Each structure stands twice: as structure tokens, then as C-alpha cells.
Design a protein with these regions (language model features):
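N-terminal structured subdomain of primase-like DNA metabolism proteins
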Residues: 1-109
Length: 109
């Protein structure tokens, strides 16, 4: 018998709204912004150097969108970022983020 895992709408909405900079705290061993980065297209873009147990990444973040410059793949939101950086399924990414959020509180600004 297959057990179906589901999440309530409030949890998914909250995690999807989580700032990516906060998500990086939960997903990485080390993450820091590149203060020398000068965005070309959007002045709000930031480049992050991220280290996880799976390797090192160079991630551009603009609002809720992210782009991995080395893998040349992008996405949107913290759940998608968790799936990419940690190689997780959707269910595992949501579980990981929600567990870490619970340790640090749900409100991030």
C-alpha cells in the first residue's frame, strides 16, 4: 500500500513565499553574497556562492527567481531551489524546508 504524503495549503503558500536568502540558510552548509557582483539586467539581482553537501553552486537570485550559472538551470521559489541544490523530491524538499522553518520560526522578512 502506497502512503500518500500531502501538505496543507498554508504550509505550501508560506514556503513558496519564503525569501530565497532565508531558504539558502536552511539548504546550505555555507552561503554568502558576492559583493563584487554587478547585475546587468536587474539591479535587484544578487549572486550567491553556496556550498551544500552535494557541492558548490553559483546562484543568481532576483526576487523569487533563481538561476544556477554553472548548471545553466533556473527556477522559482524555495521548494524548487531545495530540489535543485539538495537533489530532493518535491515531498522531501517541502519536508526539509518546513522542518528547518519550524526550528527557526515561520516569519521571515
Amino acid at each position: 500500500m502506497v502512503v500518500r504524503r500531502s501538505f496543507d495549503a498554508a504550509t505550501l503558500t508560506r514556503l513558496r513565499a519564503m525569501p530565497l536568502s532565508v531558504a539558502l540558510e536552511f539548504l546550505s552548509v555555507h552561503a554568502k553574497t558576492d559583493t563584487t557582483y554587478l547585475p546587468l539586467k536587474d539591479k535587484h539581482s544578487r549572486r550567491w556562492h553556496v556550498k551544500t553537501l552535494r557541492g558548490e553552486f553559483e546562484i543568481l537570485i532576483t526576487g523569487s527567481k533563481w538561476y544556477d550559472t554553472r548548471a545553466q538551470i533556473g527556477g522559482g521559489g524555495s521548494i524548487d531551489l531545495a530540489m535543485h541544490l539538495l537533489g530532493l523530491s518535491f515531498v522531501d524538499a517541502v519536508t526539509h524546508l518546513a522542518a528547518n522553518e519550524g526550528q527557526h520560526g515561520p516569519n521571515h522578512s
